[in-house]
């Protein structure tokens, strides 16, 4: 990843380090970039790109899901990347992180080498997130910062991919304001990367490929995973819930599940490679299997099979309360390698606000689900997502969110101020909660989140917990860091040989968000 200091350094270097004999090459490149505006992009979009439409998107459920299991790099593309390097900057969720692993796998299969320095790259991709406006602004800022690098190197390919690429307004902005971008491709087009690269090398125009059949599942894509301790495994793609504030159903497409045999095979392969923890991924992971027409098979059934595989820990994210059924609770209660941590976004504690959000459950239904989970899985760690300042949210409705948080006693929460997303139903609502009120509500909510987290963490003092050691602490290389089954970060002093292993740690100090401890050698019952 490139931090602000590094960005400024290489931008300054680009602007000052070039001798005058390069001026003609720079001018020639700028002229080439300007020529890109000649194409009639408005006409292009009117014929091949369909903007987000709630009415049209909801019709897509009838489309058959097709499975393609024969992905391979065509011979004509092999060696394309010989002598070239790639750099991918990733924004957003674990799905994007996993998509980056797939793109890195494709790049390396083409012969490219990875680099963590954008100035050394021949291809730069920004894998983007569209969940909030702030995330998009960061990407536009990054595209601007990369302009000097692009001007200096006419052969550099600069691409924007991921969720932002699926939004017409974003693509139009790039076409009009950032003509030096060479490629724009969407979340459904990752498997087309070799073809997109080839066209970008050969074309003088921007390559835009954001439309495709979204009802397919592509198997056997190459991956370059980060590390060899924890791995992500996609089990489904897309979302059909259409919460009024959310852009994901438009950027990620319809819900479509991978076949269980393909998932089981992938997890077995990871277990054989020595991975210690698997996280099953999906925009709405517990809707898994609802699109199958040939069998009744859900996330609970899949987890029941995966728990028999010899891998220490299995997690999943993100779940929707609406699809969290009794079968899944029953299987999770079996324990073993199924961890006692569930991320269960509530978004609001008010039934009225939940109705405006189209979450399709009430406060009471959510609390009943929590009761069943806690009864079946004693000591379970529940975490959540909460939005404050949704249109028309009153003070009383916000108080309901605070009271629900106190009642559930979540271990932690991701909290956000409402951000309207163009193309969603909520964007048409009047955003009538003043920003100062939103900020005050967020501050009050975060104070409660911190208070309960500190209280729950304090209970760990004196306990011995199982920790999967991931590496050195970011703040101190002499300290090791890892996570418990309930996803608590633990820092402790121990030998480097413990990295990648499951060890027992006695907690000596609890902080609001982290635990400090000491490694114990003796066999002891852990929490």
Swiss-Prot record:
Name of a matching Pfam family: UPF0004
Disulphide linkage map: none
Enzyme class: transferase
EC numbers: 2.8.4.3
Highest taxon above the source species: Bacteria
Positions of [4Fe-4S] cluster 1 binding: 93, 129, 163
Stored PANTHER family: CDK5 REGULATORY SUBUNIT-ASSOCIATED PROTEIN 1, MITOCHONDRIAL TRNA METHYLTHIOTRANSFERASE CDK5RAP1
The protein's assembly and partners: Monomer.
Its biological purpose: Catalyzes the methylthiolation of N6-(dimethylallyl)adenosine (i(6)A), leading to the formation of 2-methylthio-N6-(dimethylallyl)adenosine (ms(2)i(6)A) at position 37 in tRNAs that read codons beginning with uridine.
Name of the protein in its database record: tRNA-2-methylthio-N(6)-dimethylallyladenosine synthase
Gene: miaB
């Amino acid at each position: 990843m490139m931090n602000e200091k590094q960005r400024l350094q290489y931008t300054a270097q680009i602007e000052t380090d070039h001798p005058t004999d390069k001026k003609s090459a720079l001018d020639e490149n700028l002229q080439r970039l300007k020529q890109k505006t000649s194409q009639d992009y408005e006409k292009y979009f009117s014929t091949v790109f369909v903007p987000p439409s709630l009415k049209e998107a909801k019709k897509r459920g009838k489309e058959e899901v097709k499975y393609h299991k024969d992905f391979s790099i065509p011979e004509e593309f092999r060696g394309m990347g010989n002598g070239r390097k790639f750099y991918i900057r990733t924004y957003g969720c674990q799905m994007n992180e996993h998509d980056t692993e797939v793109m890195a796998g494709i790049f390396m299969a083409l012969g490219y080498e990875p680099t963590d320095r954008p100035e050394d790259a021949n291809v730069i991709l920004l894998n983007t997130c569209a969940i909030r406006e702030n995330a998009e602004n960061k990407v536009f800022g990054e595209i601007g910062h990369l302009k000097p690098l692009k001007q200096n190197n006419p052969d550099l390919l600069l691409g924007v991919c991921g969720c932002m690429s699926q939004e017409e307004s974003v693509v139009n902005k790039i076409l009009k304001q950032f003509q030096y971008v060479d490629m724009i491709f969407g979340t459904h087009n990752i498997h087309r990367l070799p073809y997109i690269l080839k066209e970008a090398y050969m074309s003088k125009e921007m390559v835009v490929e954001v439309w495709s059949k979204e009802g397919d599942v592509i198997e056997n894509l190459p991956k370059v995973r980060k590390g060899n301790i924890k791995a992500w495994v996609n089990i489904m793609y897309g979302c059909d819930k259409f919460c009024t504030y959310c852009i994901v159903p438009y950027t990620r497409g319809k819900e479509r599940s991978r076949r269980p045999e393909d998932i089981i095979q992938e997890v077995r392969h990871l277990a054989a490679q020595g991975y210690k923890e698997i996280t099953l991924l999906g925009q709405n992971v517990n809707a898994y299997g609802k699109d199958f027409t040939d069998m009744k098979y859900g996330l609970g059934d899949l987890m029941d099979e995966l728990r028999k595989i010899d891998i220490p820990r299995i997690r999943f994210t993100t779940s929707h309360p609406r699809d969290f059924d009794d079968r899944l609770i029953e299987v999770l209660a079996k324990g073993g390698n199924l961890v006692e941590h569930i991320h269960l976004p509530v978004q609001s504690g008010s039934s009225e606000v939940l109705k405006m959000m189209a979450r399709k459950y009430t406060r009471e239904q959510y609390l009943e689900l929590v009761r069943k989970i806690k009864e079946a899985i004693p000591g379970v760690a529940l975490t959540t997502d909460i939005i404050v300042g949704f249109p028309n949210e009153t003070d009383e409705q916000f108080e309901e969110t605070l009271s629900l948080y106190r009642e559930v006693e979540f271990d932690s929460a991701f909290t956000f101020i409402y951000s309207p997303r163009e193309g969603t139903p909520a964007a048409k609502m009047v955003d009538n909660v003043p920003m100062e009120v939103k900020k005050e509500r967020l501050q009050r909510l975060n104070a409660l989140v911190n208070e309960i987290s500190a209280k729950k963490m304090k209970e760990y003092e004196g306990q011995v917990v199982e920790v999967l050691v991931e590496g050195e602490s970011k703040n101190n290389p002499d300290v090791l860091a890892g996570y418990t089954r309930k996803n608590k970060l633990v820092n402790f002093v121990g030998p480097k040989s413990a990295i990648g292993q499951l060890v027992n740690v006695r907690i000596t100090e609890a902080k609001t968000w982290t635990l400090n401890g000491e490694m114990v050698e003796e066999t002891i019952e852990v929490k």
